Amino acid sequence: MKLDRRLVIKILEEKIKSEGIVLGSDILKVNSFLNHQIDPFLMSQIGQAFAEKFSHENISKVLTIESSGIAPALMTSLQLQVPMIFARKHQSRTLNEEFFSASVYSYTKQTENQIAVSKRFINPGDRVLIIDDFLANGQAVQGLLDIINQAGASAVGVGIVIEKRFQAGHQLILSKNLPLVSLASIDRFEDGQVVFSKQGETSHVN
């Protein structure tokens, strides 16, 4: 049965409004269902929504960054029946092989991380879908794109659970002519409340 993506978006928006906590002018805390505790039923629906939207792209890998991108990325890869890879933010003692790396600055934590993916897992010719929990300034996506380019693979699209439309990431992705799907698109924060874009889901897919 085909998923009603509009219903998934409505459920996601209601979750954000009822459980999300706005911090300052540009930070949204969604620890109760995405960034700390996970709502598996919602993540399953989100994965199905992304998989259906990008089903025509002949995807071979799904790529994200640890840790909050893992749940939606895994559910997407399950639907697409392809492997999911997460870039590590800290080099593990077990990651003693050759790897691709990139620098990613986190505006939320005010820190810069080196992210890494083993060269065994992304290959020339791979068609890679990027999935992440948030899109703000686009630094995480840029880092993943750098890794994909180093591997000689192709980025075929970007799927975002929650987009802060008022920050620079949206235009960054579109400037690279990449298909972008953001399920919940936030226009602004006002008096401690989330104001969603009147356009609803952001979808720029070829």
UniProtKB/Swiss-Prot annotation:
Pfam families: Pribosyltran. Pathway: Purine metabolism; XMP biosynthesis via salvage pathway; XMP from xanthine: step 1/1. Its EC number is 2.4.2.22. It is found in: Cytoplasm. 5-phospho-alpha-D-ribose 1-diphosphate binds at residues 136-140. The keyword Glycoprotein does not apply. Its main location: cytoplasm. Homodimer. Belongs to the purine/pyrimidine phosphoribosyltransferase family. Xpt subfamily. PANTHER family: HYPOXANTHINE/GUANINE PHOSPHORIBOSYLTRANSFERASE (PTHR43864), XANTHINE PHOSPHORIBOSYLTRANSFERASE (PTHR43864:SF1). HAMAP family: XPRTase (MF_01184). This is Xanthine phosphoribosyltransferase.
